[in-house]
Amino acid sequence: MELDSLNTKPLRILISNDDGVHAQGIHALADELRSIAEVIIVAPDRNRSGASNSLTLEQPLRVSEIAPNTYSVQGTPTDCVHFALNELMKDDLPDLVLSGINHGANLGDDVLYSGTVAAAMEGHFLGVQAIAFSLVGKRHFESAAKIARQLVEQHLAAPIPTNRLLNVNVPDLPLESLGEIEVTRLGARHHAENMIKQKDPRGHDIYWLGPPGKEQDAGEGTDFYAIEHGRVSITPLQVDLTAHESLRAMDSWLKEEK
């Protein structure tokens, strides 16, 4: 379906990320979608990986249009989507908010730290269907972009049947080598490894975060398992973090006689 063939209002897509406005992944995604949609990029001016849902509260956001429909923001991924939906596009909201393509996986507990997922989550917060895309590597961005287009076109033909944020991870493989798309749940990792202690040139202690923990819950049905077997993982996420199954137990605990 080409944009010029549409007789109705053209599809509008907002794209953001956490790797920065100049990252390869975001432009692979935008280039793939421009033939079926009007694409507006609003992304951080630099890499903001791991920013999660943070907002900039104590300084202004500086925004520059660095190319037609491409905006660089001195802020976090959440800032970018918040600005786009509440200011830049407030009079003509996009039909979709897409985030990515991230340079690396966002599997299991990663979603709690991910700026990629957070950008999509902000779109969801503000009432727009949102999808986060991540490539489990840094080579085959065209594969992830093709998967993104496939899902967008499927959404146009039959809207996504859930009011949830979607988290999509794509194996770093050529398109023809990818397995099917599998609906998954989040897996889980072991705790991250220890901090790495070093000395700076002046002899002061400095610390680096250790590598992420190995997969702890990576069995069949998880996002880790799908990726390990060459399949695209798509996980519906909800913002409500309430442990609903624990409400009754907590209520009983509070009412126990001391």
UniProtKB/Swiss-Prot annotation:
EC number: 3.1.3.5
Class in the EC hierarchy, top level: hydrolase
Domain of life (superkingdom): Bacteria
Cofactor note as given: Binds 1 divalent metal cation per subunit.
Keyword hit for Hydrolase: yes
Reactions the enzyme catalyzes: a ribonucleoside 5'-phosphate + H2O = a ribonucleoside + phosphate
Entry's Gene Ontology cellular component terms: cytoplasm
Keywords: Cytoplasm, Hydrolase, Metal-binding, Nucleotide-binding
Gene3D superfamilies assigned: Survival protein SurE-like phosphatase/nucleotidase
Alphabetized GO MF terms: 3'-nucleotidase activity; 5'-nucleotidase activity; exopolyphosphatase activity; metal ion binding; nucleotide binding
Function: Nucleotidase that shows phosphatase activity on nucleoside 5'-monophosphates.
Entry-linked NCBIfam families: PRK00346.1-3, PRK00346.1-4, surE
HAMAP family in alphabetical order: SurE
Protein name (Swiss-Prot/TrEMBL): 5'-nucleotidase SurE
Native species: Vibrio parahaemolyticus serotype O3:K6 (strain RIMD 2210633)
